[in-house]
Amino acid sequence: MARLQQHYREKIVPELTKQFGYTSPMEVPRLTKITLNMGVSEAVSDKKVMDNAVADLTKIAGQKPVVTKAKKAIAGFKIREGQAIGCMVTLRGVQMYEFLDRFVTVALPRVRDFRGISGRAFDGRGNYNIGVKEQIIFPEIEYDKVDALRGLNISITTTAKSDEEAKALLAGFRFPFKN
């Protein structure tokens, strides 16, 4: 069992039950999945860039990502239908908690000029999105072996019914919100 998973069961569930007045522990919001998505626009002209992006995301997530392909052709972006334009990986269970632990305790403090993450990036249904500008904040990525700095989007999906519940859940996981 992951460290954060145990922390969730022992500390967060009782706190949230008390705070929001849940009658059953099954009502307490929990993390469903974490999705890491990396859009690679340079892959249109150079196929090797996609391999490097997949390798980076594999190191970060600990599992192999799936290559996302264009649904439609867009002439303005020189994209053809079915062409590889990004990669994504969905984490669930123990891997999800392990990634979240590394992200909050190791990766976020390595962000330049870090003052906390925004508390406004919730979608209204209890899910949270955060964009990372550089993949080198993760300790798995070696700075010398990076060909280009690529950003990625991290989507945290929860069972929370409101943003307030989701924020309390993520704050329980020690997310450093600035407001």
UniProtKB/Swiss-Prot annotation:
Pfam families: Ribosomal_L5, Ribosomal_L5_C
Classification of source organism: Bacteria, Pseudomonadati, Pseudomonadota, Betaproteobacteria, Burkholderiales
GO MF assignments: rRNA binding; structural constituent of ribosome; tRNA binding
One GO BP annotation of this record: translation
GO cellular component: ribonucleoprotein complex; ribosome
HAMAP family for the chain: Ribosomal_uL5_B
Native species: Paracidovorax citrulli (strain AAC00-1)
Coiled-coil region: none
Name this protein carries in UniProt: Large ribosomal subunit protein uL5
Record keyword Nucleotidyltransferase present: no
Gene: rplE
SUPFAM superfamilies referenced in this protein's UniProt entry, alphabetically: RL5-like (SSF55282)
